[in-house]
């Protein structure tokens, strides 16, 4: 600690900004110099470990005291992870104080279910200093100003926001002229068509988990032509993604949608290099365009019908992956692992292409199959790929964890007996 004490204040503040705030405050016991240094650290990072109603006051008291005594001219970051019982009035006050301190990064998390929704202070909607805003809590946006003004905001994360109308969503995003990253998880709101119109947006994750929707003609409308990374997930039984625009700079896309126009989706994704799909089986006549840049494709096994269709349109494909995970509900903040279909939607038939796709002849090198069950349709797909992929180097198959040793041995014997057109192809089975 003596060596650190020799450093200039600015350097010490930088070091302390990487330390939890409780530890930072405790440094006031080290010496007279350290007694006041913590007050100038431009970051408050508090994570409340309590989940019981009788202890939430400890978090309120600590945060109140820190903000009251804090003397830095600018509060760079306010990061709060709070228990579900933290009073909404306290959170609203802390947000207001942070805005008055010209906060740049405002990250508020509250465990759900909570004691009640939060009404964001109106001053937040015109905070021009914000660069990143994370609101992972149950909050309502209904008393918003006519215009939002987030001139500096580059990253916006909204989980479980309750917007009162389509118009408020439009006004919010139009007030973010330099927005680059957006994450949305919808649970229940009053928005019919959630329009994401953001010309500067480069990264988007949009997830619809609503159980009830106001009508049938609802969903996301995405107008973001500069996207480089796109993730769309729909677990709602009644809504879908209404429309997309062409995204010529798209590099990575993951689409898991129970309802929607497959033709519309595929035609807008042709520039991507990495693609993951979990969609309704396509119609034979579905035009999808040519994926000239695609090198990695991940298909959910509920969508095996896409395999035959898309292989004919991916001349440079090098990696092909199959998987389906639906046995349990993954945590909401990690829904990318979850199949959007029910068990009855798993495809049981597959027809091989009428002619061998170009990628199987010249580019496909790796095939992976996660949670292989040994079903007849799975064996047919594996057999076709082994018998026709001339450049294939690796076929890696991982069985379900619940598969017993006898079943694994039988699967391995069946797979090993399949003829491989590429003699250098290695078969890995676990």
Swiss-Prot record:
Boundaries of every FBD domain copy: 349-399
Family annotation (CDD domains): F-box_AtFBL13-like
InterPro entries registered for this protein in UniProt: F-box-like_dom_sf (IPR036047), F-box_AtFBL13-like (IPR053781), F-box_dom (IPR001810), FBD (IPR006566), FBL13/AtMIF1-like (IPR050232), LRR_dom_sf (IPR032675), LRR_FXL15/At3g58940/PEG3-like (IPR055411)
SMART domains: FBD, FBOX
Domain F-box: residue ranges: 1-49
Protein name (Swiss-Prot/TrEMBL): Putative FBD-associated F-box protein At5g56440
